[in-house]
Amino acid sequence: MADFVLDVPKKNSNQAMKTLIYTLLLFGSLKSENSPYVVVLGIAQDGGLPHAGCVQKCCKKSWSTGENEKVSSIGIIDPKTGQSWLIDATPDFASQLNILENVHNTKLSGIFLTHAHIGHYIGLLQLGREVMGAKNMPVYAMPKMQTFLKNNSPWNQLLSIGNIKILSLQDSKEIKLTRDVYIEPFLVPHRDEFSETVGYRIVSQNRSLVYIPDIDKWSKWDQDIFKVVLHTDYALLDGTFYSSDEIPHRDMSEIPHPFIIETMDLLNDMNSKNRKKIYFIHFNHSNPAINHTSSTSNIIRSKRFNVAKEGLILTL
């Protein structure tokens, strides 16, 4: 099945409500097939859009209109069981959880963490005493990530009072979520100040998806990204920066990511069918590709790559 975008209105208006009703009706026909799927719940880098301290053109409209882009996260949904799982607990956890539970009509069954950078785990605090008071929410983490949560406040309070329980992940070891869905973490090189960093491979009986929101450079990885894309059906890849000139006041060596132009050049020899598997995600506020209708996004699509959008559904 082709990908599908469920647009959840970001502003409260009659037209927005009409759009929501329409998309929910359309979405109902998609769910009738009962295939598991992945939904994109956010596309921005850790700081979101608008970004703290940003008064540049890329943020001005968002500050004035209140429209925003949520921090990157995806949900895994199995309609047969009514269960869902989050990859990463972002600063936008509350609204992303609401989308999973009240738009997609699922029960959150666990959270998989990629690493200990702020956009990927601080949403766990919403599970605590001050907000949800959750009971033993499964949180899946790699060894160093576990140690970080257990040895630092306020995260260790979530454990001590039973808001969360930590379940262990191992590199390249598959975990069964339901009869039809598996997930496998794999290590990727990233700054790793507080924990290791992983991407995820999500597999059903029919299709597979790779999610890598953060990596330093493809050349530093012990896997060949070209081959990884060839052997999957969808690849959501780090698109933090489009090029090196986006934030001239910052030392880019301190925040390494593969530029989108680098990734497109690296994978340019792929045929069009394989390039269309790729969706860039995790856009910095400075990256013009965060605007789905920008000329930069159009350039990416003209090269037969894709730009992820909140609400995108990829059927497994």
Describe each PLM feature range.
Residues I77-Y140, D233:
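Active-site metal-binding motif and surrounding structural segment of the metallo-beta-lactamase
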Residues K144-S153:
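A short, active-site helix/loop in glycosyltransferases that binds the activated sugar's phosphate group
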Residues T19-G28:
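Sec-dependent N-terminal signal peptides
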Residues V5-V8:
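Short hydrophobic alpha-helical segments enriched in small aliphatic residues
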Residues E33-L100, I166-V228, L312-L316:
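Core dinuclear metal-dependent hydrolase active-site scaffold
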Residues V203-S208, I215-L312:
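Cap/insert and terminal regions of metallo-dependent hydrolase folds
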Residues K11, Q15-L20:
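Positively charged n-region of N-terminal signal peptides that target proteins for export
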